């Protein structure tokens, strides 16, 4: 989604005044004035959400639904379209995906109440209950269960301070971090917000930083640090914010802007988020958008999850676990102690195989407590969410008790903290609530509380009595049907119900006379094939049934509200338990993956070493295994930023298709996995943490920004040379290939020298400029490795093995031949190459080549009569005599030619 096109509705739209409008249209226009100008208004009318005026025009086009007219206003026809309320979420999902925002105007009373309040012409009261935006979704039908849905706010103060605050409304997660200007793109790419709030003056810049996010510009006043601090204190009911962190002014501004926007989206209700967690600057490995895309961490270049690194290692069994794993890959750590804590948790589950399998079986039953809790807190939850919470916390307690029974060893920090969050023995109120939810809610409750029928029998005596009265009345209806049928002698008589007539007697048209003459039956409706009647008894019975049903439903809704309030009181403990379950899922799943893929625990340090023995590319290895194309060839990689244990800059040469790019990417992914706190696909690994990861591998035109492929490549290279530090890790592939040979070689040469002397970082530099390999002789911390190939019976065989030293050939012409270049072109290329290699000076050699000397196409080979006859012979079908005759015949043919 392009950011500049994510405002499909202008922010300066205007609508007609309500003067002269009908009462209903007057109400619509009043609500329309309250809603954000850049949002569509879904106006509830019975079983439909209707849209009017410009909203209808835009929505009908986006949803491909009919656009009609509904009367006139101020002399102009009123455009209208609508969607059924029962399927509204599907339409909402399409609008949100297209970048729209939608204000929802709900009916706040039923028509009966409206009539009782203001007579037959009274308009049902309506109010905007929420504004649905890409970053404020909570419904399962609108979200991918395995993907976080974040909304972020970027605050940039005039002092130069900047900060990002972000939240996932669907889980309650809320964080903030200071951010340096040069890291903005990397930070935004890491969180991948569905929606980004920015100050109006920074909209254009933000559009470049977050091309896939919906941008929401806000007035400067929304980013005021002082008012934000007051808002934060009120929101979390504290006197000082130091309990949550020592926030900078920029952090306060970002937090406040985000809270204010979320409150507006809830029609003024406060956001239901956990207290903000502060993330220190530099706490995560910085990965810029280009690097993130080229390494295909969470999505491939085509946008698919399949084929990404996340897809290759994900063995999680819960949606919260999948989201947490994706977050870890998106934001690897730089703190060795925190990385080791994650690795300790994986190691613990790696050793406890039986317990791990039992845990994973239990987790499959746990559901998504994080999102269920958030929906309940926001007033969007239902009975199923209550049941889901109870099930998750019950499973959590069982998991905790079983893991605590382990006698293998003491659990590491992350595991012990999770066990503490799941054990209910020291949380009596939460334990009591879970037990109450289990008793109160039926096994398969409805989605919405208003549907009723979710409170279990025996939980509330008065509710049971009302249900019995309601059900008994329904049995009386069945008895009345039989009585009426016998009284009038019409066995086909039926008692039915609809929302217009209530209960009524229905007979076919030919039996109508039998009831018309009976005073008990009051004629109500004649249809083509049936006649309908009512009776005094049915009317009285319906009133009793309706009264009992209404009272029972009201009692259930009250019970739901009470249980929801109790859940809200325990929200912090429930969140802690839900996070623990997700933590266990990630650790156990990574242990499972490590076992399946023979991954090793990396040894982490603060130095600058990068020693990999038998490293493999996790995605390519998995693809080979699935396709049955053999085993991946492992390779070592040794780098040292200090240049002591190994070279810090290594040139990688070798034939096309030999695996240079794969080798580069696999080492970048190994570093990233290690810093994410995962085992790595290698026999052994010793890794010093990096502060930034850069990948200049592959490029494409960026026509929207007026950039050619070469320009895009140079911009990425410039960013690396300007920003990489001695602690960074860089992979570069074919720098300078998009321009003239000498220009490209010169650029690549200068970039290599700069990486070595100025940046001083660990770097892998793949190139076909063999002249570059001479730098290893001149630069003290530069070296050469190459991908090996062998010629066998005229064919080139790629070994995919990395060895020391530089390659002497690229075999590009051989690869071109394999790709299907015409033979004449291949031969011409071979001739040109031979001349160039012999003369050693490309410009001079080319001028000496006879133009088009070999460009005349060779004649197609003529197949002789002998060859044709030989092709027709089946030697196994010939007798010795027949074979001899054929031989004489072939010899005779040769004499003719």
From Swiss-Prot:
InterPro entries: DNA_mismatch_repair_MutS (IPR005748), DNA_mismatch_repair_MutS-lik_N (IPR007695), DNA_mismatch_repair_MutS/MSH (IPR017261), DNA_mismatch_repair_MutS_C (IPR000432), DNA_mismatch_repair_MutS_clamp (IPR007861), DNA_mismatch_repair_MutS_core (IPR007696), DNA_mismatch_repair_MutS_N (IPR016151), DNA_mismatch_repair_MutS_sf (IPR036187)
Swiss-Prot/TrEMBL keywords: ATP-binding, DNA damage, DNA repair, DNA-binding, Nucleotide-binding
Family matches, as Pfam families: MutS_I, MutS_II, MutS_III, MutS_IV, MutS_V
Binding site residues for ATP: 654-661
Record-linked CDD domains: ABC_MutS1
Cellular compartments per GO CC: cytosol
Any GO MF annotation of the entry: ATP-dependent DNA damage sensor activity
Gene Ontology biological process: mismatch repair
Entry's family note: Belongs to the DNA mismatch repair MutS family.
Function in brief: This protein is involved in the repair of mismatches in DNA. It is possible that it carries out the mismatch recognition step. This protein has a weak ATPase activity.
Full protein name: DNA mismatch repair protein MutS
